[in-house]
């Protein structure tokens, strides 16, 4: 499989080829996804919820992100790795945005960065792109704005908000973003945006008309039971499989079944006899 990059994402849209993405936060999972042929891996600030146990993504820091981005880039050889910019790492100033985006590329070795917002982050996106760093936008339901939205709610259902989201998409393209994540918006609105902009749209809860799709892998595999978004399709119940394995392990250890001889190391009995005789 050829190495995925920004150009392959853009070419995919022009060739009507769907783009596949998933989130990953560690080496082993990134390696599995990479071997499966995934186009892109997002190291999302969603790690705050699914890995660190936060109630939202707002507490995630740059150090948290860099720690996980480094792990993922070690495991992904062919997938494009996109590093999320956490809350307040780019909103404060254009300078901070470029500096922190640079850390994700330079220290984390990611191939691109992602940040939330449209019109409001136009200058930040433009400056980051000018610094030769590829940017993936993110509009619609933006989790870092959860307090403004009053929760994780579908966005763009009325005319005014729908028009604002369309304008966000246009401005991100104008600023130089190479793609845009559309999250939690009606599929007809996502279709309009996908047809309006020339850069790829990656949907998560935005219907089938986007140029690509992304899911949080814990959601699709049944590994995160705190809540399950409506738009998530289950591709397996790994949570139940893992839970059963843990229970079986606990039972076998308590009952003396594991480890048996098959899982133990052996040595010559004569050596043991000598140790006993010598009082060791």
Swiss-Prot record:
GO terms for molecular function: 3-methyl-2-oxobutanoate hydroxymethyltransferase activity; magnesium ion binding. Coiled coil: none annotated. It is an enzyme of class 2 (transferase). One of its GO terms (biological process) is pantothenate biosynthetic process. SUPFAM superfamilies: Phosphoenolpyruvate/pyruvate domain. Mg(2+) binds at residues 45, 84, 116. Its EC number is 2.1.2.11. Binds 1 Mg(2+) ion per subunit. Belongs to the PanB family. NCBIfam families: panB, PRK00311.1. Homodecamer; pentamer of dimers. This is 3-methyl-2-oxobutanoate hydroxymethyltransferase. It comes from Clostridium kluyveri (strain ATCC 8527 / DSM 555 / NBRC 12016 / NCIMB 10680 / K1). The gene is panB.
């Amino acid at each position: 499989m050829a190495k995925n990059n920004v150009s392959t994402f853009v070419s995919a849209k022009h060739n009507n080829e769907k783009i596949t993405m998933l989130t990953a936060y560690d080496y082993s999972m990134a390696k599995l996804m990479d071997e499966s042929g995934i186009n892109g891996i997002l190291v999302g600030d969603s790690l705050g919820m699914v890995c660190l146990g936060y109630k939202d993504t707002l507490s995630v820091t740059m150090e948290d992100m860099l720690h996980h981005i480094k792990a993922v880039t070690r495991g992904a050889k062919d997938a494009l790795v996109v590093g999320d910019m956490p809350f307040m790492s780019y909103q404060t100033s254009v300078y901070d945005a470029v500096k922190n985006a640079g850390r994700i590329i330079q220290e984390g070795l990611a191939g691109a960065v992602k940040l939330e917002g449209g019109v409001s982050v136009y200058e930040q996106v433009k400056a980051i792109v000018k610094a030769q760093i590829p940017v993936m936008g993110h509009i619609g339901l933006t989790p870092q704005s959860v307090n403004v939205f009053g929760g994780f709610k579908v966005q763009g259902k009325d005319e005014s908000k729908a028009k604002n989201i369309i304008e966000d998409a246009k401005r991100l393209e104008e600023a130089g973003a190479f793609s845009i994540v559309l999250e939690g918006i009606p599929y007809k609105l996502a279709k309009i945006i996908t047809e309006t902009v020339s850069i790829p749209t990656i949907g998560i809860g935005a219907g089938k008309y986007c140029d690509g799709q992304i899911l949080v892998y814990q959601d699709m595999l049944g590994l995160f039971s705190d809540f399950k978004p409506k738009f998530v399709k289950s591709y397996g119940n790994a949570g139940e499989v893992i839970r059963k394995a843990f229970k079986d392990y606990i039972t076998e250890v308590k009952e003396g079944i594991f480890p048996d001889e098959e899982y133990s190391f052996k040595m010559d009995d004569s050596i043991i006899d000598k140790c006993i005789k010598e009082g060791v």
